[in-house]
A protein has these predicted regions:
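SAM-dependent methyltransferase
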Residues: 152-222
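Conserved class I S-adenosyl-L-methionine
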Residues: 1-59
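Conserved SAM-binding strand-loop segment of SAM-dependent methyltransferases
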Residues: 93-107
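Conserved SAM-binding loop of SAM-dependent methyltransferases across substrates and taxa
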Residues: 60-72
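A short acidic, Gly/Pro-enriched loop at the edge of an enzyme's catalytic core
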Residues: 110-117
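Conserved SAM/SAH-binding beta-strand->alpha-helix loop
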Residues: 80-82
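A short glycine-rich, Lys/Arg-flanked "PGG" loop and its adjoining helix->strand segment in the class I
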Residues: 135-147
Length: 255
């Protein structure tokens, strides 16, 4: 298969990487609670033998850092070189071991059966713009797992897509960037089941100056139930939805 470099995804996350932490009101606290939540989920579903993890959509390390801090052996990968570099720098700053490299989730640099669990969190898979592409990625996740190993996918819970041309603004609230008070927001522009997204940091006050803006990237508003069906189609067993673990629905499946 010839890989599309997904230039818009790389450009978006390379631009966002230095200030990705602003997506969360308290990134450090979120790293900790997501690490706790995922560790509890891994133990509850697959037992205490899960130690070798692959975070195949690592980004700047929100989940990988929390799990590495709990003693898991984490290898992370992402399409965005800047995100991988930041995750590595954050791990070093914390005294953690986190191996990271640039890779497409549809073609992972991993030996078959080399992981106890694979993670793809934070609505990353819908950057793949068709069910066929998502299925390829899920098959790669399955290939990486040992028999009995588990896959964890977190996704936005999409409803029906609005009319094409609809624009939505998602306000993330007040933030501070380099000493300046601002607001963080996402701009969504719909075109059928596909929508384009950009982040903006906007100064508070009368000027409403845009301090920072990412390039746009694109998502596929795929329902959670469809991704669960695709997991089953590639060979995952006991696929089910878990709510209340993270801030988005989670799917788990076992090789």
């Amino acid at each position: 298969m010839r890989l599309d470099p997904h230039a818009s995804v790389v450009e978006f996350y390379d631009a966002l990487a230095p200030w990705y932490h602003l997506v969360y009101p308290d990134w450090e606290a979120s790293i900790a609670w997501q690490g706790d939540a995922l560790a509890a989920l891994l133990a509850a579903v697959w037992g205490d033998g899960v130690r070798r993890l692959r975070d195949v959509t690592m980004g700047v390390g929100t989940q990988a850092l929390g799990l590495a801090a709990r003693g898991y052996q984490v290898i992370g990968s992402d399409l965005s070189p800047s995100s991988v570099r930041r995750a590595g720098a954050e791990a070093t700053r914390r005294g953690l071991t986190l191996r990271g490299h640039v890779a497409d989730v549809r073609a992972l640099a991993a030996r078959p059966g080399s992981a106890d669990a694979v993670l793809a969190c934070d609505n990353a898979l819908p950057h793949l713009l068709s069910e066929d592409e998502i299925q390829v990625a899920l098959a790669e996740c399955l290939r990486c797992l040992r028999p009995g190993g588990g896959c964890v996918v977190s996704l936005r819970d999409y409803g029906p897509a609005p009319a094409p041309g609809t624009e939505e603004i998602k306000d993330y609230g007040h933030r501070v960037w380099e000493g300046r008070a601002c607001r963080l927001r996402q701009i969504w522009r719909w075109r059928g089941p596909i929508y384009d997204v950009a982040f903006e940091l906007v100064a508070t006050g009368d000027s409403a100056e845009i301090i920072l803006r990412t390039p746009s990237t694109t998502y596929f508003a795929v329902p959670v139930a469809r991704v669960a069906a695709l997991m089953e189609a590639v060979g995952f067993k006991r696929v089910r939805r878990v709510d209340g673990c993270l801030f988005q629905p989670v799917l788990v499946g076992t090789r």
